[in-house]
A protein has these predicted regions:
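ATP-dependent adenylation/nucleotidyltransferase module used to activate substrates
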Residues: 1-140, 148-151, 178-186, 236
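A short, charged, Gly/Pro-tolerant segment at domain boundaries
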Residues: 202, 220-242
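Short, surface-exposed helix-loop/turn micro-motifs enriched in polar/charged residues
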Residues: 96, 131, 195-199, 221
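Residues that form generic nucleotide/phosphate-binding pockets
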Residues: 13, 17, 79, 146, ...
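Catalytic subdomain that performs nucleotidyl-dependent activation
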Residues: 60, 113, 136-216
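Short amphipathic alpha-helical patches
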Residues: 38-41, 67-70, 103-104, 144-145, ...
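Residues that form or immediately flank small-molecule/cofactor binding pockets and catalytic motifs
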Residues: 67, 92-94, 173, 196, ...
């Protein structure tokens, strides 16, 4: 199996999240949703690597939901071969559906992608679906919902979606975007270029830039937002201390 440098950047916070929230159980078959971006690719590599020493035995399979945007996932397929992980690509026409209904845009795309991912994971007999949302994503989601929807809400670290027989987990919730970037760069991990015309032109991107600017003026803003989420117990988060 491929060796990784600076693996502790990802493995240490990932293992802590997995243990704190009981994300992995003996005999799990975990489907990692791999978009080809840095977060999901780093998550895939970390979960594959952790199989070596984690006390509970589990399997990993990588699933890419191809939106029909002409993106080349060959590098991800090769990476999966290098780390001994089964790779499955699901072809869809989601992009066509989404751009015919532009009023719903990104939210519709997200729902359709998630549905296709869960359906394929169920077909493969998986017990868990892992997504690559980071600590930064948690904070951005809170600010987005507060500013644009008038509610205090984030996504759950671990939950079972309605109508599904498997658990959704987010093992990177303690991992910063900065650590993910450093890990990916250090190991020259393949990142698939996103051909979506909405990439970098979303509300989330605006909020990301807003928080980054606040971080420059007042270091630790991101971490304090995250700690507030934990202390308030929002959507399944718990306060396990610093």
């Amino acid at each position: 199996m491929k060796e990784f440098e600076k693996a502790s950047l990802i493995l240490s916070p990932l293992r802590r999240a997995v243990q704190n929230y009981g994300m992995i159980e003996e005999g799990d078959k975990i489907a990692v949703g791999v978009s080809g971006g840095k977060d999901s690719t780093a998550l895939l590599c970390a979960l594959a690597l952790m199989r070596r020493f984690y006390p509970l035995k589990y399997e990993v399979v990588a699933i890419t939901v191809d939106l029909g945007l002409g993106m080349d996932y060959t590098p991800i397929e090769k990476l999966c071969a290098d780390i001994d992980v089964e790779y499955v690509r699901v072809e869809t026409d989601i992009s066509k559906i989404v751009f015919e209904k532009q009023s719903e845009g990104c939210s519709l795309c997200s729902r359709l992608r998630r549905g296709a991912l869960h359906t394929e994971a169920e077909r493969l007999g998986c017990t868990k679906v892992a997504l690559g949302h980071t600590k930064d994503d948690v904070c951005q989601t809170l600010v987005m919902n507060l500013f644009y929807a008038g509610k205090i809400e984030v996504f759950w670290p671990k939950n079972t979606p309605d109508g599904r027989n498997m658990t959704l987990i987010r093992p990177l919730i303690y991992t910063t975007e900065k650590s993910v970037k450093e890990f990916c760069n250090k190991n020259a991990l393949p990142i698939v270029k996103n051909n979506c015309p909405m990439d970098k032109n979303t509300v989330r991107q605006d909020v990301r830039e807003m928080i980054n600017e606040a971080e420059k003026k007042n270091k630790g803003v991101n971490h304090r937002i995250f700690r507030a989420i934990e202390k308030m117990g929002i959507d399944g988060f718990s306060d396990f201390g610093e």
